[in-house]
């Protein structure tokens, strides 16, 4: 499965696409929430040009 690499609060993070719950666009950035485990929800964002195609496909599916 694909992963998304991003920085959040100065920390490099990586999350598996399968853990992503919600995806939305903010300007040229793709923002998302994901399951961190233990009942916690994490947030992240990646530029549109750096986003993996699977994340962009999730965004298109949610628009419909």
From Swiss-Prot:
Family: Belongs to the 7 kDa DNA-binding/endoribonuclease P2 family.
Subunit (UniProt): Homodimer.
Protein name from the UniProt record: DNA-binding protein 7a
Residues found modified as N6-methyllysine: 5, 7
Principal EC category: hydrolase
Keyword Endoplasmic reticulum recorded: no
Domain of life from the UniProt record: Archaea
Protein species of origin: Saccharolobus solfataricus (strain ATCC 35092 / DSM 1617 / JCM 11322 / P2) (Sulfolobus solfataricus)
InterPro entries found in the cross-reference section: Chromo-like_dom_sf, DNA-bd_7a-e_arc
Keyword field: ADP-ribosylation, DNA-binding, Endonuclease, Hydrolase, Methylation, Nuclease
Post-translation changes: Lys-5 and Lys-7 were found to be 60% monomethylated. ADP-ribosylated by endogenous proteins in vitro.
Alphabetized SUPFAM superfamilies for the sequence: Chromo domain-like
Keyword Membrane found: no
Annotated EC: 3.1.27.-
Its biological purpose: Can constrain negative DNA supercoils. May be involved in maintaining the integrity of the genome at high temperature. Has RNA endonuclease activity with a narrow substrate specificity; the cleavage products are 3'-phosphooligonucleotides.
Molecular functions per Gene Ontology: DNA binding; RNA endonuclease activity
Any one Pfam family match given in the protein's UniProt record, by short name: 7kD_DNA_binding
